[in-house]
């Protein structure tokens, strides 16, 4: 048999050197074209366009070499003649950096700090400052276990359970943290799980075997109260279960773990320990209320997400507490900002019960300054100078309201996650982070060209807050894989925070690791009481039909609806979102306006913005102006209807179904969408859905089966795809039904709040245990974050102007 020969894997630089040596003229020609763009940043589509434009013979010579591979993996090229630096993404979360001298055709490898320093020259010119603040979290997590496979990203809890069970199997003493963890459980002074009769592992195993033997003699339905006193005498307290059967299951699981730990048993056991009774959910910005707020500035999907999340979470908590054999009423507090100028909403009310719950409330706390309470709405980009006093006040309010510390704090969006970090740090409780959207990815190059953005958006403070929160938190929930690590061709939201620079402030050489096991994908659903299939006739809310028909087809043009639909027999393509640049509603209108085939086939209805009042939001003002211009320029009246934002969620659910009755479709055209709750809502109603391929909807929709993915940067193609669909449906109506049914099936399999709630509480348990066993290891990073907060964030927050009352 031939002897196996090990060959060295050549570095990226070596492979590029080899290609340069073999094809100097062809590569020089290409790089010269890149250099001719002059100083600046070139994105992937620009680089590939230049490559496609070179002569076919020259291109063919490069096709089989490392150069094409590098080019397709390059996320940006920094051009500073004669140098071109490339940021090369080999796979999600794995990057390399090189630069090429176009004149000398020399390739140099760059470290992350060297690449960022080179990039800064776009703004600062050549600088000799060797003392730029560099932020590096890698040393604090180097000893933590992490997966290395791309498929493991977003499955952190599974990896963590495997690691913990392997560690526990190492020797008997490794079980001691589990014993200590079980002994610390109590609620308002009442001991749970184990009492002080059990001091060591030997006693624990002995007691568990005795309990197992006794429980096998009882009927499975025997109530815990029947043997509670007997268990107390041997060291076992309430929390194991409400019946003999459930208690026996728990005791057998623990005995199995003590004998031979495995990851599945560990997760199941930790998930059934009574740990979460009081939950605080932070969402300070916008108009947070249950009615008449959707469509207000900064008030959209996040509010819907939380108001759907909380009833499902409470139901799961009540179910678990009952099954644990406890008589405890859980509490959930949604903490938001109190707005004295509530403009016809309940945002000025301190405490408001959440609909459909027994023990959940919205708790509102005002922003205040030395001059008193701030009365008016403030943009989410301008909340930073108020956060510190707000967090102090929130700490006092939740302690008074709960009469206990929360067991879990969940942050939402940048300022909610910063608040959650500071509160969790102060109270020593488990923290969960939900970003919803990280603005850095929504505004390309807002880091390097910070000066162009900071006066309007104050990204210096926001990006700093994001870094603090994502590194402080115990676990992070995302709705999709793309939110963490993008796709084969696109960079993820969190991934974009791995390395970046804000010239004049600091460089981030290691901001986050997408392989960190704190990341978990837990997708939300839609409220099944509001969003159900159009075909369920007995549940349909036909009472709303006259209002909906008036909304869509009335000949009246006013502040609520502009333009009329002349042909009521056409299907309707429909969209509903906030009217801002990223949501791209005006983009959809432009695609429709410029496609005669689509205009002939269908009507277009857009719900977004509020023409009933003057907007204070600058982006909304700009988008409104653009919408008026499109209507006039393309003579859309007769085929198009622009409806002001609709705040009645119950009626909106029926609106989706009414559009389905017209054999229409829903379109979500955003330039980027972290998840896409409206996509889930539309699909839940059986409405065929076309949604952006930039972000979460690309994971929700299986193209051609449960809907269609569209590229918001290629509007002509998107419009043609829509036209093709409706032409096919005209010939074959079953095609519409097939896509509708495919969407419903997809939602039922993956996107429900029941699945979400079960997963969230299990995560809280596992990471609560992880926090307990690794508390000493986490201390260092938290001290580092304290310093970063005090020395950097506070100063940046103070630079944000206070609102003028």
From Swiss-Prot:
Keyword annotations of the record: Glycosyltransferase, Transferase
Coiled-coil stretches: none
Keyword Transmembrane helix tagged: no
Region (GT-B glycosyltransferase): 275-752
Superkingdom assignment: Eukaryota
GO molecular function: sucrose synthase activity
Role according to the record: Sucrose-cleaving enzyme that provides UDP-glucose and fructose for various metabolic pathways.
Protein name: Sucrose synthase
Species whose genome carries this gene: Solanum tuberosum
């Amino acid at each position: 048999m031939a002897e196996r020969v090990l060959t060295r894997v050549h570095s990226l630089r070596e492979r590029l050197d080899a290609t340069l040596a073999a094809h100097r003229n062809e590569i020089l020609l290409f790089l010269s074209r890149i250099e001719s763009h002059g100083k600046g940043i070139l994105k992937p589509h620009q680089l590939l366009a230049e490559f496609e434009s070179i002569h076919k013979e020259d291109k063919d010579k490069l096709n089989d070499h490392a150069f094409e591979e590098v080019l397709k993996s390059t996320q940006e090229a920094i051009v500073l003649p004669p140098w071109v630096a490339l940021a090369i993404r080999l796979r999600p979360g794995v990057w390399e950096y090189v630069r090429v001298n176009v004149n000398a055709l020399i390739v140099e490898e760059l470290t992350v700090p060297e690449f960022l320093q080179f990039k800064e020259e776009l703004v600062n010119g050549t600088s000799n400052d060797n003392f730029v603040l560099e932020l590096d979290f890698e040393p604090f997590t180097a000893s933590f276990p992490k997966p290395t496979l791309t498929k493991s990203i977003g499955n952190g809890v599974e990896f963590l359970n495997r690691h913990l069970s392997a560690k526990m199997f190492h020797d008997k003493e490794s079980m001691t943290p589990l014993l200590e963890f079980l002994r610390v459980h109590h609620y308002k002074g009442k001991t749970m799980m184990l009492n002080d009769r059990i001091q060591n592992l030997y006693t624990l195993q002995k007691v568990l075997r005795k309990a197992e033997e006794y429980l096998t003699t009882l009927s499975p339905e025997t109530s815990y109260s029947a043997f509670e006193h007997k268990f107390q005498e041997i060291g076992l307290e309430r929390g194991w279960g409400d019946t003999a059967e459930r208690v026996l299951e728990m005791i057998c699981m623990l005995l199995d773990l003590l004998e031979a730990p495995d990851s599945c048993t560990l997760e199941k056991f930790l998930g059934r320990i009574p740990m979460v009774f009081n939950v605080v959910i932070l969402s300070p910005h916008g108009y947070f209320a249950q009615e008449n707020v959707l469509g207000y500035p900064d008030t959209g999907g996040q509010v819907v997400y939380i108001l759907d999340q909380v009833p499902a979470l409470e139901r799961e908590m009540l179910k678990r507490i009952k099954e644990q054999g406890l008589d405890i009423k859980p509490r959930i507090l949604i903490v938001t900002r109190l707005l004295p100028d509530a403009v016809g909403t309940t945002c000025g009310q301190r405490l408001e019960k959440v609909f459909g719950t027994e023990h959940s409330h919205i708790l509102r706390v005002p922003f205040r300054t030395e001059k008193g309470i701030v009365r008016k709405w403030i943009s989410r980009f301008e909340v930073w100078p108020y956060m510190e006093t707000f967090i102090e006040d929130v700490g006092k309010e939740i302690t008074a309201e709960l009469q206990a510390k929360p067991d879990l704090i969940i942050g939402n969006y940048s300022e909610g996650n910063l608040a959650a970090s500071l509160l969790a740090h102060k109270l020593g409780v488990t923290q969960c982070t939900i970003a919803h959207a990280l603005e850095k990815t929504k505004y390309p190059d807002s880091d390097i060209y910070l000066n162009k953005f900071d006066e309007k958006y104050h990204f210096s403070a926001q990006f700093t807050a994001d870094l603090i929160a994502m590194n402080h938190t115990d676990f992070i929930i995302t709705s999709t894989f793309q939110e963490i690590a993008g796709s084969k061709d696109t960079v993820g939201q969190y991934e974009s925070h791995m390395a970046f620079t804000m010239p004049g402030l600091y460089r981030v050489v290691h901001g986050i690791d997408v392989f960190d096991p704190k990341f978990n994908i837990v997708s939300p659903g839609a409220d099944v009481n509001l969003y159900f299939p159009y075909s369920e006739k007995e549940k349909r809310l036909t009472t709303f039909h006259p209002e909906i028909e008036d909304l869509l087809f009335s000949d009246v043009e006013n502040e609520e609806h502009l333009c009329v639909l002349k042909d009521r027999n056409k299907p309707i393509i429909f969209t509903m979102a906030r009217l801002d640049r990223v949501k791209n509603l005006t983009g959809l209108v432009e695609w429709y306006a410029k496609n005669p085939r689509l205009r002939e086939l269908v009507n277009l209805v857009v719900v977004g913005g509020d023409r009933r009042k003057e907007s204070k939001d600058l982006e909304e003002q700009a988008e409104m102006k653009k919408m008026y211009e499109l209507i006039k320029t393309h003579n859309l009246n007769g085929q198009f209807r622009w409806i002001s934002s609709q705040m009645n969620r119950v009626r909106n659910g029926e609106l989706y179904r009414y559009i389905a009755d017209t054999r229409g479709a829903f379109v979500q055209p955003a330039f980027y969408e972290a998840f896409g709750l409206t996509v889930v809502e539309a699909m839940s109603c059986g409405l065929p859905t076309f949604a952006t391929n930039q972000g979460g909807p690309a994971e929700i929709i299986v193209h051609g089966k449960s809907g269609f993915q569209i590229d918001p940067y290629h509007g002509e193609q998107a419009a043609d795809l829509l036209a093709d669909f409706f032409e096919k449906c005209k010939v074959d109506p079953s095609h519409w039904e097939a896509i509708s049914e495919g969407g419903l099936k997809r939602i039922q399999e993956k996107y429900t709040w029941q699945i979400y709630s079960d997963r969230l509480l299990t995560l809280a348990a596992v990471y609560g245990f992880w926090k307990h066993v690794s508390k000493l290891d986490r201390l260092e990073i938290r001290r580092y974050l304290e310093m970063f907060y005090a020395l950097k964030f506070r100063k940046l927050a103070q630079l944000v102007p206070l609102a003028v009352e």
